[in-house]
């Protein structure tokens, strides 16, 4: 395909590689908690979006991860893919986040280690990126919203709840459901949101 990188192709999954990847995501790992892809080019770690310059709705999660990694593990730049690298459409990173709901990252490993006269070993950068991946895997539980209902009050026709989020991800589609002992749904709330960094009422 001779289209520029901002063109997603003739149709969705027009390339066999992206089609196979979407099948894998949907049929093998539909409930994954983390998705990582690797690429060579420059040294940077990218999160969604590649297609749009706006920050994702879970920007608090990605900024938290960036700050933790840069403060304690590596000085690898961590950016929104569109702003940090260039606009890029049709990536598994954007599909995994936007459609499947995974936290997703692309690790770009620069190719300077392959140049003649380089003083950096190929394994140095890869080792550092492996440390970052290890951090992401060891803390994977926190990359989702983990809601705890601290208090529920029912007064007349109103239900009030206090919710804490133990994870670092926001959610916009939490609901409160009420079932009887037979498992029959008697009532459910509208969707409500809980940010990653607050206690909601």
List each model region and its residues:
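Structural beta-strand segments of beta-rich domains
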Residues: 157-161
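Short acidic/proline- and small/hydrophobic-mixed sequence motifs that coincide with surface turns
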Residues: 168-173
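Short amphipathic, basic-aromatic surface patches that mediate peripheral association
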Residues: 163-167
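Intrinsically disordered, low-complexity Pro/Gly/Ser/Thr-rich segments with frequent PxxP/GP/PP motifs
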Residues: 181-201
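Solvent-exposed, conformationally flexible loop/turn segments
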Residues: 90, 154-156, 195-201
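Metallocarboxypeptidase
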Residues: 1-155
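Conserved aromatic beta-strand anchor motif in extracellular beta-sandwich/beta-rich domains
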Residues: 176-180
